[in-house]
């Protein structure tokens, strides 16, 4: 399945691209033709660099190879750190939309105002947002003030740590200079990560927790240390509290862990699977109960799941499954009754599916358009959500950053587009050549999560921002995929020694 998914993404990423102009309040995608030749040339350049680094490793020896790996990961981390700090410190990028609502809820809770918990208010409507609101309230209480700038700095550090996690994964799984160096450098060059440092929401923690969990799982299988499992459970729990989409990774962890246990009994791994499932759910229930006790208000279940599923089936103005202003009208019409609105949304889903089936070719076109509007957007809405700012702290730097959403916007999109194609193609190589019956199943955690994320994006509300985390999970997979291509070439073609 993974090969088919990536073949689909590679085919369209090679020929077209979509972007969203950084204009607040207008989530309108523009689709334009892409350059097949330039995309293929970029991939060929990556393969050439892999070949060069492979030759260097053979001739230079292990000592120099180790230093080259360290230099590569240092460069990747430095770029993400410096670029991220410049992005968040040059100007005041004030939270808006969902992030502002969550921060506002945390501040209200500190002040003893629990109005947001009402069924028709933000945390009552989106009950899952109590997780990040509770975490931010705790942080603000520790700091003594509600300063979102601290969170932005923390996100920069998490980005840097994420690059090191990719380094750790590649070092443990492969160890080859080309794989480790190129994987960390490519991940370090991702501009979407830089732009999302100012987005005070769950995307950056979600990425870090995913990469950290994958690294710890590889280390556990290799070294057998219980601390690695503790790290996984902690990361998955925190990730789920901050961004509930992390549950896709939790399910992936349980799947690969279960397969591993069936083939080789491991009591500690089994316990970690149970805890990874139970702790996030228990923490959420504890948070719900805590706010019930503090506010004296009954916990609102909010929008039913069927509302998001119906939204993912709707088309408004050529936008497939994307949010629109009146999508929650049925919930409000039932006086915010979750059970009654759930029944209404289910009936609407059935009617919508029948209408889609009645139009020949529409169903295929709808879901193709929906998938591409999420996965074929190389910036993943990172500039769209983060281009705006308030006070300027460093005029020259802020002026340069403003140009990224102005006259340099096309260049940013094109660079991100080349990188996206490189990663998608490398990930395709990974699924074709690295996923084998005899491969260690626990090394496939991120691969299973990417497949799960793709399937999730078919049914749920559409948004390119939601795919950013899965894109970052692809970087170590792509690095290993290109490495396997070079290994096969080395074995069968170019680097084979001639017999005398």
Describe each model-derived feature in a short phrase.
Residues 29-43, 149-150, 369-447:
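Membrane-interface anchor segments at the N-terminal boundary of transmembrane helices
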Residues 289-394:
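Membrane-proximal stem/loop segments at transmembrane-domain junctions that anchor or position
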Residues 1-85, 269-277, 493, 500:
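Start-transfer (signal-anchor) and selected internal transmembrane alpha helices
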Residues 166-189, 441-444:
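Transmembrane-helix signature of polytopic, membrane-embedded enzymes
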Residues 192-206:
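Short acidic/glycine- and proline-prone juxtamembrane loop motifs at membrane-interface regions
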Residues 153-174, 212, 426-430:
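Transmembrane-helix motifs of polytopic, lipid-linked glycan transferases
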Residues 126, 130, 134, 142-161, ...:
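Loop-to-helix entry region of an early transmembrane alpha helix in multi-pass inner-membrane enzymes
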Residues 90-107, 111-146, 344-345:
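Extracytoplasmic catalytic/substrate-binding loops of multi-pass membrane glycan-assembly enzymes
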């Amino acid at each position: 399945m993974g090969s088919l998914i990536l073949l689909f993404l590679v085919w369209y990423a090679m020929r077209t691209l979509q972007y969203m102009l950084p204009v607040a309040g207008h989530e309108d995608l523009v689709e334009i033709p892409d350059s097949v030749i330039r995309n293929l040339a970029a991939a060929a350049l990556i393969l050439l660099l892999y070949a060069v680094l492979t030759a260097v490793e053979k001739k230079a020896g292990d000592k120099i190879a180790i230093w080259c790996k360290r230099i590569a990961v240092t460069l990747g981390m430095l770029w993400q750190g410096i670029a991220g700090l410049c992005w968040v410190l040059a100007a005041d990028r004030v939270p808006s939309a969902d992030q502002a609502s969550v921060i506002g809820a945390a501040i209200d809770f500190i002040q003893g105002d629990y109005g947001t918990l009402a069924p028709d208010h933000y945390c009552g409507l989106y009950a899952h947002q109590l997780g990040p609101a509770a975490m931010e309230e705790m942080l603000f209480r520790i700091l003594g003030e509600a300063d979102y700038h601290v969170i932005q700095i923390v996100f920069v550090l998490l980005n840097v740590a994420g690059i090191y996690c990719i380094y750790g994964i590649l070092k443990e799984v492969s160890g080859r200079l080309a794989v480790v160096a190129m994987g960390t450098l490519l991940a370090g060059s991702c501009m979407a990560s830089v732009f999302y440092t100012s987005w005070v929401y769950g995307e950056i923690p979600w990425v870090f927790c995913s990469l950290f969990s994958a690294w710890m799982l590889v280390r556990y299988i290799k070294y057998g240390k219980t601390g690695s499992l503790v790290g996984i459970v902690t990361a998955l729990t925190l990730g789920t509290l901050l961004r509930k989409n992390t549950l896709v990774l939790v399910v992936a962890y349980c799947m690969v862990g279960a397969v591993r246990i069936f083939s080789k009994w491991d009591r500690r791994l089994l316990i970690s699977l149970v805890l990874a499932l139970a702790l996030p759910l228990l923490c959420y229930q504890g948070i719900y109960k805590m706010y019930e006790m503090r506010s004296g208000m009954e916990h609102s279940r909010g929008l039913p799941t069927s509302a998001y599923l119906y939204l993912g089936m709707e088309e408004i103005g050529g936008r497939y499954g994307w949010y629109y202003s009146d999508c929650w009208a049925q919930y409000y019409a039932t006086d915010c009754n979750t059970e009654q609105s759930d029944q209404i949304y289910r009936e609407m889903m059935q009617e919508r599916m029948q209408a889609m089936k009645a139009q020949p070719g529409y169903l295929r076109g709808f879901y193709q358009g929906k998938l591409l509007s999420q996965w074929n957007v190389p910036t993943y809405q990172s500039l769209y959500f983060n281009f705006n700012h308030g006070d300027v702290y460093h005029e020259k730097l802020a002026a340069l950053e403003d140009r990224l959403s102005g006259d340099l916007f096309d260049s940013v999109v094109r660079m991100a587009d080349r990188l996206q194609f490189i990663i998608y193609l490398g990930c395709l190589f990974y699924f074709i050549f690295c996923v084998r019956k005899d491969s260690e199943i626990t090394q496939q955690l991120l691969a299973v999560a990417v497949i799960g994320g793709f399937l999730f994006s078919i049914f749920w509300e559409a948004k390119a921002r939601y795919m950013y985390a899965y894109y970052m999970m692809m970087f170590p997979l792509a690095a290993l995929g290109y490495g396997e291509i070079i290994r096969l070439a080395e074995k069968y073609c170019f680097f084979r020694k001639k017999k005398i």
